[in-house]
A protein has these predicted regions:
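Canonical positions in the second alpha-helix
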Residues: 64, 97-98, 131-132, 165-166, ...
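Register position in tetratricopeptide repeats
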Residues: 84, 118-119, 152-153, 186
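Terminal, low-structured helical/coil segments at or just beyond the last alpha-helical repeat
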Residues: 185-217
């Protein structure tokens, strides 16, 4: 029974274990900022520059732009390809340069509005969508983009108004139908929202994932 004193030495070792723990919270904090760009990417896994540079469309457009940096159409097209591959910052840069050369390009304003909405730059997105709609009133794509921007910003009534206007022009616009469903649910009209969502899913089963990629669920 004299061995009862032996449990005490291990206790001395215990204090050495806790010190590493304070570092864990620091490591846990940065990740939340990183996931969005990854989640947003549609199909291609990593959208790192080597992969983008190898894309044949981007390659040929970049070669075109090397010869003529003021080719607004090539900048716009490359911006579209970047956006489709989840390289949103590069897309914004190309749309901005394209608009510098062609300040009345409604499509470029709408595309930059949409990309800025996806990355959460909502104030700038609103300006772009409003400019697109000033240049081309009732432009269905810009109404759809602004609806998404309002939905992300929690402006559900404005989102419903934008999606309503878009659906009046194109009743089969799945993104507006699904977006309106979410906005209606959040605004308290749950049954109406459910109906819009069910109809949108029947038209395009991928719409749920698409919106999740935009940061909207």
């Amino acid at each position: 029974k004299g061995s009862s004193g032996s449990p005490t030495p291990p206790i001395a070792a215990a204090p050495t274990a806790p010190p590493p723990q304070p570092k864990a919270p620091e490591i846990a904090l940065p990740p939340p900022a990183a996931p969005p760009p990854v989640v947003i990417q549609p199909t291609p896994a990593p959208s790192n520059s080597p992969v983008l540079a190898d894309d044949p469309t981007i390659k040929s457009l970049s070669e075109k732009l090397d010869k003529n940096p003021d080719d607004a159409a090539a900048l716009y097209r490359r911006g579209q390809v970047y956006a489709s591959k989840g390289a949103y910052d590069l897309a914004v840069k190309d749309f901005t340069n394209s608009l510098r050369l062609n300040p009345k390009d409604v499509e470029a304003y709408n595309n930059r509005c949409w990309v800025r909405t996806v990355i959460g730059d909502l104030q700038a997105a609103l300006k772009d969508c409003n400019e697109a709609l000033r240049l081309r009133p009732n432009f269905v794509d810009a109404l759809d983009s602004r609806g998404l921007m309002n939905l992300k910003g929690g402006q559900n009534k404005n989102a419903i108004a934008d999606f309503d206007a878009a659906l009046k022009i194109n009743p089969r616009l799945t993104s507006s139908l699904y977006g309106r469903g979410l906005a209606k649910q959040r605004n308290g009209a749950v049954a109406e929202g459910d109906l819009d969502i069910a109809n949108a899913k029947a038209m395009d089963p991928n719409i749920v994932k698409e919106f999740a990629d935009y940061g909207v669920q």
